[in-house]
Amino acid sequence: YMDVIAIHRSGAAAAVAPLGTALTPEQIALLWKLHDEPILCFDGDAAGQRAQTRALERILPLLEPGRSVRLAALPQGMDPDDLIAASGPEGFRKLIGTARSLVDSLWEQTQAEFDIRQPEARAQFWQAVRGHVRSIGNNQVRSAYGDEIESRIATMRNQIRGISSM
């Protein structure tokens, strides 16, 4: 809860935390009542990355048109309180301003699990990211994510083949 207090002291309009529990579907629904695209910020350590992965797994089935999240990535080993202490409120506002879209975060986080220089690992990555798309409950959102992911895979294939994307 010290992170939330530090964020409030930095001048943020609102900040909440699940207080040591994983983000639940009920908490996600409450966040969406406050904002259609809340920004999630997890600690920049291994536990924070695991929490982010679990949160994404819980959010994907709940996505609806006009409802998503953005993710702000803290520097390695830092939590919000550390960042504010080191960089001041402006540093935290800057971090929030660079929050990534859910589809970008999903792509990057999944890709980081694989050495995509190897064809077998690249195939595993594509399989994993497509699996995430299949977990989206809403048909329209799942279709839109599928189109985006397939476009990124096609771009990656073209880069491997030495074809520049248009």
Predicted segments — roles?
Residues Y1-D3:
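Short, polar loop motifs at secondary-structure junctions
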